[in-house]
Amino acid sequence: LHLSLRRQRQMCIRDSNTAVSVAAEALDRLHTTGETHHRIMVLEVMGRYAGWIALESAIAGGADVALIPEIPYDINKAVEKINERREEGKNFSIVVVAEGAIPQGGTITVQNVRNNGAGVDNNKLGGVGQVVAKQLEELTGLEARTTTLGYVQRGGTPTAFDRVLSTKYGAKAMELALEGKFGVLTVIKNGKLDSVSLEDVVGNNTKIGAVSGNTAESNIRKVTMDHDLVKTARDIGICLGD
């Protein structure tokens, strides 16, 4: 499940445990080839205009750099981090890049601009991992390789956490239907199962994700700078590109 709200307050209808687990496992595997071949391994992950998957997997998978849409990055900051590691005798680095990551003063990387005519954003994001890898290779002199997980993150066997969560949501949805309550979405609110009107969720969000300059005009729930994940990443030395 991966649906996010700007008006979340104490509401949570977003979880991506399986996707994060897949990305973290990929990072575990990339450590091996990165270390043995003295390379910069760049992993591009999904998430559209939000950096939840990138940030969580970077923490879980021991990445050195994590670039997310919410923090426009300065590639030189990533270079500094990589060079610091080299001075410590670590001739490889792991970089996680969210597909919606944006360079400072730049624009989002879009493979294909698509619009259904009703203002709905169907842009195909992707490719920023290659851009970052090329820049890092040129600026550090180290080989850089890119891995893009893409839809691998969305398939396969879900984690036990996601199985339990989806079952809880499904049971709650059935309960609501039997009560004749329609047009609602099951959520976790204040730690308990609840429901919210679809109108509150969707509202005017049919025109989400319109990219203007370097700004993704959307109503999705993004990582905030005071979130504990941001603090944790910084505390353990992950460079966020700023």
Language model feature labels by segment:
Residues L1-I13:
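Single conserved hydrophobic/aromatic residue that forms the stacking wall/gate
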Residues H2, H37, Y151:
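Histidine-centered active-site/metal-ligand motif
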Residues R6-R7, E70-Y73, E99-I102, L149-R154, ...:
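Short, ordered loop/turn segments at secondary-structure junctions
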Residues Q10, R14-T18, T157-R163:
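Short beta-strand elements at the ligand-binding edges of bilobed clamshell
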Residues S16-E35, E44-E143:
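Accessory alpha-helical/coil subdomains and C-terminal extensions
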Residues R39-M41:
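Generic beta-strand structural signal
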Residues K124-D242:
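C-terminal non-catalytic interaction/assembly regions of soluble proteins
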